[in-house]
């Protein structure tokens, strides 16, 4: 492997932004495990609720990544948050819809798709606002 990391992480308010750095063929299983563990740890931090995965550096992903994405989405849901995706290619969007993981209200780990990071962050901020209003 080169010095490149599988994921880049950023925190924006209560949102963990994960940017995968493809192609994944450059990475080993241990790299996936370490990246997942770090993302899970960051989602477990107090005040972090939502997950945003930015696919701007990725053209394709396989079943290993789908499994990782599912587990992180379930963790966000356990934190009373949601998962959002942005910059999905048509092929990625189609695959996630076929797997019934994208915009599917019948599952508790459904993800929403957005054109870009700003739109996704606004969506998640609105979710937080609605949740905070319900608490009052």
Regions found by a protein language model. Give the residues of each.
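STAS-typified acidic loop motif
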Residues: 2-38, 55
